[in-house]
Structure formats: C-alpha cells, structure tokens
Swiss-Prot record:
This is Small ribosomal subunit protein eS25x. Belongs to the eukaryotic ribosomal protein eS25 family. Keywords: Ribonucleoprotein, Ribosomal protein. One of its GO terms (cellular component) is cytosolic small ribosomal subunit. GO terms for molecular function: structural constituent of ribosome. The keyword Ribosomal protein applies.
Length: 108
C-alpha cells in the first residue's frame, strides 16, 4: 500500500473565531468643558478708545464680534453698537430678533 497523504482541509472563507466571550465595556468620556471667558462689564478708557477707532473699520460688526475682539460682554457690545449708530460711524445691514448685523458707514 502506498503511504497515505495527510489531507489538509480546504481553507474556509470565514475568518476563524477569535475567542468571543465578554467584550470590554465602553468607558464614558469626560465631557469637554468650555473655558470661561472673563470679559469686561464696564469700559475702561483704553478699550473705549479702541472701540471708537477700530470698530468702524470692521467689515462686519455684530455684538458677538465686538465681544470677542474687545473682550467685553454681550450687553456692553450692544450698547457700544447703539452708540456707534448714533454717531453715524456704522450702519445697519440686517436686524433679526436674535442677531443684528452692521457694517462700516460708507460716505457717499
């Protein structure tokens, strides 16, 4: 008799199961906390001068932009816009209940 050849089973298309069992529990990620901005509540002279000189040169002026660039709080930014409007250095583009948009006043 001829020696028997060891039959190798044909490779299966399914991947071999890697020990099922319990999977690791997903850990809760700690929520990202927003950094608190410490904006000014009242104008000091330097910030007020900066407002009068720089703000009318901005192409787009909103309370949030003034608040961000001058480090003043929102209510102060709205007051500042009202004052710049009264002086005629900026003009309104659009007013919505939640967002007011202004731009520099073009003379012409």
């Amino acid at each position: 008799m001829a020696p028997k050849k060891d039959k190798v089973p044909p490779p299966s298309s399914k991947p071999a199961k890697s020990g099922g069992g319990k999977q690791k529990k997903k850990k809760w990620s700690k929520g990202k906390q927003k950094e608190k901005v410490n904006n000014m509540v009242l104008f000091d002279q330097a910030t007020y001068d900066k407002l009068l000189s720089e703000a009318p040169k901005f192409k787009l002026i909103t309370p949030s932009i003034l608040s961000d660039r001058l480090r003043i709080n929102g209510s102060l930014a709205r007051r500042a816009i009202r004052e710049l409007m009264a002086k005629g250095t900026i003009r309104m583009v659009s007013a919505h209940s939640s967002q007011q948009i202004y731009t520099r006043a073009t003379h012409g």
